[in-house]
């Protein structure tokens, strides 16, 4: 993995230069943390612990890719379609006043509001061709998780006939600016050139589909790839023009805690 200081002092400024040069509006830069155990990692035990602590998240295990995702990429039941993208993050605090202040600072942050707006506008644009009606909450709401607060906006719509299947919707929406960037093609190239890690299945769509084309898919974040005695953990941040490198590094540390705290209990 790349050292935190190099990630903060070299990679973030490199991407911010590209943003300032108008090459791209937003890029999601990820970090990798590798844990090594002295025996095979017990996936079932980890899933149980994730379930206990993350009641509102989708708990998943796909052949050793495990996690507790709070972010709904898209669901489709009949003609009804729903998404709940998350972009914009603040760290949670044990002390109530500090935690309330963190929430309020997130709501007041112009940087986080812009990062969120980029994601919502992109998602509405991509969903619109499939829908006869689509709507989004006028303002983002706070989603509070055990280690972080997020800005989230619920998007709902009615599919045009013949209704697209969940897999068609997933294909159209992945990867969103919440895990890649905007514009998508340019952001993905920058990630490939600069990020310097193998994301494996991190941030990929995870979910289920039935024979009628209904289903529900989350974004594969707050996740780890288990390979024998090793666990590869991932956390990403959305970089925009106003991003501050140390704050972004702190944000990855908070996001790692979902999985890291679970592994450290073993």
Predicted feature locations:
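Structural motif
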Residues: 26-27, 56-59, 80-81, 117, ...
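Conserved hydrophobic core element of enzyme catalytic domains
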Residues: 69-72, 154-266
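Contiguous alpha-helical scaffold segments within structured protein domains
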Residues: 1-13, 17, 32-36, 82-84, ...
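Extreme N-terminus nucleophile/cap motif
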Residues: 23-27, 32, 36-49, 53, ...
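ATP-grasp fold ATP-binding core
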Residues: 21-30, 60-62, 119-121
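A short, polar/proline- and glycine-enriched secondary-structure boundary/capping micro-motif
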Residues: 78, 92-98, 242-247
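Short, well-ordered strand-loop elements centered on a beta-strand within folded domains, enriched
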Residues: 66, 78-87, 133-136, 214-220, ...
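SIR2/sirtuin-family catalytic core signature
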Residues: 36-82
